[in-house]
Amino acid sequence: MSDKKLSDNERLKTQSNYLRGTIQDDLADPLTGGFVADNFQLIRFHGMYQQDDRDIRQERIAQKLEPLHTVMLRVRLPGGIITPHQWLGIDAFAREHTLYGSIRITNRQTVQLHGVLKDDIKPVHKLLNHLGLDSRATAGDVNRNVLCTANPVESVLHRQSWEWAKKISEHLLPRTNAYAEVWLDKEKIIQPDDEPILGKSYLPRKFKTAVVIPPQNDVDIHANDLSFVAIGDGDQLVGFNVLMGGGLAMTQGDTSTYPRLATEFGFIPLAHTLAIAEAVVSTQRDWGNRENRRNAKTKYTLERVGADVFKAEVERRSGVTFSPLKPYVFSERGDRIGWVEGIDGKYHLTLFIPSGRLLDKPGLPNKSGIAAIARVHNGDFRLTANQNIIIAGVASDDKAQIDALARQYGLLDSSLSSQRKDSMACVSFPTCPLAMAEAERVLPDVVSQIEHLLHKYGVGDESFVFRITGCPNGCGRAMLAEVGLIGRAVGRYSLYIGGNREGTRIPRLYKDNIDVPTLFDEIEKLIALWAKERNIGEGFGDFVIRAKIIMPVINAPVDFHTAV
């Protein structure tokens, strides 16, 4: 640790009494609908962000009212598996006790509830506890919800990998009893709090972990601080290749921030998984930047000390030496929409959920549809990192009923294009306080325009990975797209191109801070060139690199911000 002044977040964590703060006082305060001072940040460690409806913010200011404070709550669902019973409990709460009545499936395989008023916060935590769930560590400077490839076909390997995702999640959770005391009204335990892995100040910044089963890269391993690539022998999981230091967030105008691909460390057998996970987290805990949060993520620690030095420290702390990497390859990221049969003889139905938003609308009552399926389904639900949902483990005798319900509620759409399936957006307006431009709300129309251009140039059956994020923080994973938009201001975006379908290359800035008409003009020119000059089977991202329309990002810390 240097002599530089620590960021204020470090003070509030250290002084929080292991994440308790004075949250209870704010809950009892009838004069405000929100949390103030340090508690505004501390509730994140309990799985919540304070938000307000930005569509009506100015109107409320004019009326001399405080913003309409609510919280967004994330459930902890390692690997995205949830039972129908649990789903129905969350569905009912969203319908009856949130301002928006929706459920948002995230690209980290969990659900968010937006618009929870302060009086309903304790009840929702108690509901989750009753359902066998919680929201611990789904936000804040801790290890977040652990991802796992939602592979519905390789069911044996998936089950084994998911079990490890669950073990990693549990092992790295905060040990403090604050969550139970504050939200579940549990009595304070006399035994002193201790955080043997995370420490009293927790981590320098958020930490993301994923388990991935090749050839699927649906979890986007290069968006994660720590990734475990499943290595199987037949249908048996034997170990993991370990990757470190991925991450996509950056700060506009700050060239010391950048997206970064993860570094391969080596192979470990299963028995060493938790020891390696703990050693990686504790090394980042001790070596990460606590003075400047912009440079506090693990990717910057690796760049500052060197990947080899970081790796050696992980080996020293864990007592485990990495073996050479086992071969693996990624060939796809998207979900297989529709029915597939698993090797266990069960059927699995993947349903496309636009932007992960479940909300009954005229002609598309998709939230009610999932609830109807949950009432009759005997398997489980699996949320995907592409914001979709898998009705998993359907017996052959039940397949027709599930299929009929999906069609009745508009959840199976034969006209769904490849481009729409390959597109994603973060939430952005109206609830995200960091949003600079629209994302989720404009995605349907933007994709329709792209579909029109693809058909115009004779490639209507083709697609490219397309993502919009309302700010540079990376939630929409635009920095692993073939075409990515990052919001700069209302109606203005920066256009990045040159990623690939596999999610193993970072795109480069092509046009900065352009308005929407200019954006579509540029995309049209690129689609026209791709349609005319591409090689057989050549993806859009690979084409713009080969055609030298844009130069590839080879080493992001060095060349991401280079003008080429």
Curated annotation (Swiss-Prot):
<comment type="similarity">
    <text>Belongs to the nitrite and sulfite reductase 4Fe-4S domain family.</text>
</comment>
<keyword id="KW-0411">Iron-sulfur</keyword>
<keyword id="KW-0004">4Fe-4S</keyword>
<dbReference type="InterPro" id="IPR011786">
    <property type="entry name" value="CysI"/>
</dbReference>
<dbReference type="InterPro" id="IPR045169">
    <property type="entry name" value="NO2/SO3_Rdtase_4Fe4S_prot"/>
</dbReference>
<dbReference type="GO" id="GO:0050311">
    <property type="term" value="F:sulfite reductase (ferredoxin) activity"/>
</dbReference>
<comment type="function">
    <text>Component of the sulfite reductase complex that catalyzes the 6-electron reduction of sulfite to sulfide. This is one of several activities required for the biosynthesis of L-cysteine from sulfate.</text>
</comment>
<keyword id="KW-0028">Amino-acid biosynthesis</keyword>
<comment type="subunit">
    <text>Alpha(8)-beta(8). The alpha component is a flavoprotein, the beta component is a hemoprotein.</text>
</comment>
<dbReference type="GO" id="GO:0020037">
    <property type="term" value="F:heme binding"/>
</dbReference>
<dbReference type="GO" id="GO:0019344">
    <property type="term" value="P:cysteine biosynthetic process"/>
</dbReference>
<keyword id="KW-0479">Metal-binding</keyword>
<dbReference type="Pfam" id="PF01077">
    <property type="entry name" value="NIR_SIR"/>
</dbReference>
<protein>
    <recommendedName>
        <fullName>Sulfite reductase [NADPH] hemoprotein beta-component 1</fullName>
        <ecNumber>1.8.1.2</ecNumber>
    </recommendedName>
</protein>
<feature type="binding site" description="axial binding residue">
    <location>
        <position position="475"/>
    </location>
    <ligand>
        <name>siroheme</name>
    </ligand>
</feature>
<dbReference type="InterPro" id="IPR036136">
    <property type="entry name" value="Nit/Sulf_reduc_fer-like_dom_sf"/>
</dbReference>
<dbReference type="GO" id="GO:0070814">
    <property type="term" value="P:hydrogen sulfide biosynthetic process"/>
</dbReference>
<dbReference type="Pfam" id="PF03460">
    <property type="entry name" value="NIR_SIR_ferr"/>
</dbReference>
<dbReference type="GO" id="GO:0004783">
    <property type="term" value="F:sulfite reductase (NADPH) activity"/>
</dbReference>
<keyword id="KW-0349">Heme</keyword>
<dbReference type="GO" id="GO:0051539">
    <property type="term" value="F:4 iron, 4 sulfur cluster binding"/>
</dbReference>
<keyword id="KW-0408">Iron</keyword>
<dbReference type="GO" id="GO:0000103">
    <property type="term" value="P:sulfate assimilation"/>
</dbReference>
<feature type="binding site">
    <location>
        <position position="426"/>
    </location>
    <ligand>
        <name>[4Fe-4S] cluster</name>
    </ligand>
</feature>
<feature type="binding site">
    <location>
        <position position="471"/>
    </location>
    <ligand>
        <name>[4Fe-4S] cluster</name>
    </ligand>
</feature>
<dbReference type="GO" id="GO:0050661">
    <property type="term" value="F:NADP binding"/>
</dbReference>
<feature type="binding site">
    <location>
        <position position="432"/>
    </location>
    <ligand>
        <name>[4Fe-4S] cluster</name>
    </ligand>
</feature>
<dbReference type="InterPro" id="IPR005117">
    <property type="entry name" value="NiRdtase/SiRdtase_haem-b_fer"/>
</dbReference>
<dbReference type="GO" id="GO:0009337">
    <property type="term" value="C:sulfite reductase complex (NADPH)"/>
</dbReference>
<keyword id="KW-0560">Oxidoreductase</keyword>
<keyword id="KW-0198">Cysteine biosynthesis</keyword>
<dbReference type="GO" id="GO:0046872">
    <property type="term" value="F:metal ion binding"/>
</dbReference>
<dbReference type="InterPro" id="IPR045854">
    <property type="entry name" value="NO2/SO3_Rdtase_4Fe4S_sf"/>
</dbReference>
<dbReference type="InterPro" id="IPR006066">
    <property type="entry name" value="NO2/SO3_Rdtase_FeS/sirohaem_BS"/>
</dbReference>
<feature type="binding site">
    <location>
        <position position="475"/>
    </location>
    <ligand>
        <name>[4Fe-4S] cluster</name>
    </ligand>
</feature>
<keyword id="KW-0521">NADP</keyword>
<comment type="pathway">
    <text>Sulfur metabolism; hydrogen sulfide biosynthesis; hydrogen sulfide from sulfite (NADPH route): step 1/1.</text>
</comment>
<dbReference type="InterPro" id="IPR006067">
    <property type="entry name" value="NO2/SO3_Rdtase_4Fe4S_dom"/>
</dbReference>
